[in-house]
Amino acid sequence: MEALVYTFLLVSTLGIIFFAIFFREPPKVPTKRMK
């Protein structure tokens, strides 16, 4: 059970960090949505 909790926390933390960086800085990956 502990492994599942730690995995969930790790994924959620990485997701939040990636989300924050993605919205703070312009995505370096070419996206068709922007232009």
UniProtKB/Swiss-Prot annotation:
Give compartment(s).
Plastid, Chloroplast thylakoid membrane
Ranges that cross the membrane: 3-23
Key word Transport present in the record? no
Q: Which InterPro entries match?
A: PSII_PsbT, PSII_PsbT_sf
What is an example of a Pfam family matching this protein?
Answer: PsbT
Recorded hits in PANTHER family, A to Z, give: PHOTOSYSTEM II REACTION CENTER PROTEIN T (PTHR36411:SF2), PTHR36411
What protein family does this chain belong to?
Belongs to the PsbT family.
Known function: Found at the monomer-monomer interface of the photosystem II (PS II) dimer, plays a role in assembly and dimerization of PSII. PSII is a light-driven water plastoquinone oxidoreductase, using light energy to abstract electrons from H(2)O, generating a proton gradient subsequently used for ATP formation.
Instruction: Describe its assembly.
Output: PSII is composed of 1 copy each of membrane proteins PsbA, PsbB, PsbC, PsbD, PsbE, PsbF, PsbH, PsbI, PsbJ, PsbK, PsbL, PsbM, PsbT, PsbY, PsbZ, Psb30/Ycf12, at least 3 peripheral proteins of the oxygen-evolving complex and a large number of cofactors. It forms dimeric complexes.
| Name of the molecule in the record | Photosystem II reaction center protein T
| Species whose genome carries this gene | Drimys granadensis
Gene encoding the protein: psbT
